[in-house]
Amino acid sequence: TIGDGDGWLYVCVVESYEEDMAVLKILEKKKDESELPSKIYLFQGLPKQDKMELIVQKAVELGVYQVIPVATKRAVVKLDAKKAKKKVERWQQIAVSAAKQAGRGIIPAVGEVCTYAQALKCAEELDVVLIPYELAEGMEETKQIIAEIRPGQSVGIFIGPEGGFDE
């Protein structure tokens, strides 16, 4: 069985092979059922140092559909366009490796670094959006929202940088 990274599995047999190539015959195509029933979008505030690499790795291993790096006012890390492009390329490589390691049916994308305002605009298209807040009182409403998430819904989760989000 071979996965294509886009959520499909193919049951194949090897028809022939050479030193650097194999010819396979597809016997069956089926949807990979290993993915979460909801698409989880992680809007991650840029953390200090190389912590984003570990965040991308673990998020992908846990089933996140897409990681969107967010440059916030309180973030210690400030990336210019050139640095941001290189970082995103590196994070995408980490996502590919983590997806393979975890046996994911898809390769989650790492989006371009965006501003908090751009992230909020993007999140408007999602079914459910959660922004954990360290000064929030009680968890009942959050638990209720999470309990009501249904298969097929898209869920955005915002996680701030070390300095938190701006009030």
Question: PLM ranges: what are they?
Answer:
Residues 149-167:
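A glycine-rich beta-strand to alpha-helix segment
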Residues 9, 19-21, 35-39, 152-154:
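Short connector loops at helix/strand junctions that flank enzyme active sites
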Residues 50, 138-140, 165:
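Glycine-rich nucleotide phosphate-binding loop and flanking beta-alpha elements
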Residues 1-31:
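N-terminal positively charged helical leader segments and presequences
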Residues 119-124, 142-150:
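Short amphipathic alpha-helix with an adjacent loop that forms part of the alpha/beta core around
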Residues 27-131:
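RNA substrate-binding interface of SAM-dependent RNA methyltransferases
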